[in-house]
Regions:
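Alpha-helical tetratricopeptide repeat
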Residues: 2-317
Length: 317
């Protein structure tokens, strides 16, 4: 098929995915650094309740209740730096990135050396697409807390998003060096994302080594199998790519991109009926996940394949 057809256009939209530990890493920062210092906790027992309750609600995933509790804490002016910082994080979980940025800025006005506020604000900027400002905040986080592996990891994600893959590799390497406790899930995610930067630089051997290391650390890492499949696809190893996609789908039956890439591969190999089945399944998952633009792309591709099949003289597989 010609390189400018919708088939190749769709394939570009289902390249390997950058990791998603950015928010997960923040939970670690909340638990480890989110409590007031003991010297300040006795200022107001009543106000301290709202701050602690907000943190507990945030950890439990009750974001609206956490927001209300942090509002109460802020109204009582109890430990404003911490309350604003954690309300910033709550806004991030609620995908209200503008208010998150504002709250973290307020936190820093109260306490200019609050590395968590820089860290959280960096994520808000990242989600708003302001990558240079996100880098600035992660740089400041690292200046204040040089051993904070999450900051190196997040900065690496920003560099990778900006296609600065050599710099991303340096940050992922530093993140791995800074992890002092055995955290297999976090390690697996970092190896997986370092592998993506290697893959972007066509360092296929290093990419595969990182994806396999991610799987040794977490055998249920569907993303690592997907990325191995992408590597095999780029190397022209189509059957191996399909085998890795099969594993990814077995782990995550709702993995829309895995169905779609497998469908594209099967189409490429001439297995048209199974390709259509995969593309339809992937399209359904995209729709259910609210990714309507990609959903319409896949529907257009399915229609294109149907039209292509009508012109084939021989029975289809």
């Amino acid at each position: 098929m010609h390189k400018d057809t919708p088939m190749s256009t769709v394939l570009k939209n289902f390249l390997p995915h950058l990791g998603r530990l950015v928010i997960v890493a923040l939970l670690c920062s909340l638990v480890l650094g989110g409590w007031p210092r003991q010297g300040k906790a006795a200022q107001s027992v009543h106000s301290s309740y709202w701050l602690r309750s907000g943190i507990e609600q945030l950890e439990a995933g009750n974001y609206q209740q956490a927001l209300q509790d942090f509002n109460q804490s802020i109204e009582r002016e109890n430990n404003l730096a911490l309350a604003y910082s954690n309300r910033c994080l709550t806004q991030i979980y609620l995908q209200d990135y503008l208010h998150a940025w504002q709250d973290c800025t307020r936190s820093l006005q109260q306490q200019s050396d609050n590395y968590l506020a820089y860290f959280h604000r960096g994520l808000a900027f990242y989600r708003l697409g302001d990558y240079p400002q996100a880098l600035t905040d992660y740089n400041q986080t690292i200046r204040l807390k040089p051993t904070y592996y999450q900051a190196y990891y997040n900065r690496g994600l920003v560099q990778a998003t900006m296609k600065n893959h050599p710099l991303a590799l340096a940050d992922f390497n530093q993140s791995l060096r800074q992890i002092t406790n055995w955290q297999p899930d976090a390690l697996a995610t970092i190896y997986n994302d370092r592998g993506l930067s290697h893959l972007a630089l066509h360092n296929f051997t290093s990419a595969k080594a990182d994806f396999n290391q991610a799987l040794r650390l977490n055998k249920n890492n569907a993303s690592a199998y997907y990325n191995l499949a992408c590597t095999a696809h780029q190397l022209g190893e189509y059957e191996r790519s399909i085998a890795d996609l099969n594993r990814a789908i077995a782990i995550d039956p709702f993995y829309a991109d895995a169905y779609i890439r497998r469908g594209l591969l099967r189409h490429q190999l001439g297995y048209y009926q199974s390709a259509l089945a995969d593309l339809n399944q992937g399209a359904n998952h995209l729709y259910q996940q609210g990714l309507h633009h990609n959903y319409r792309q896949i529907l257009a591709l399915i229609e294109q394949i149907h039209q292509q099949l009508l012109s084939l003289p021989s029975p289809i597989v």
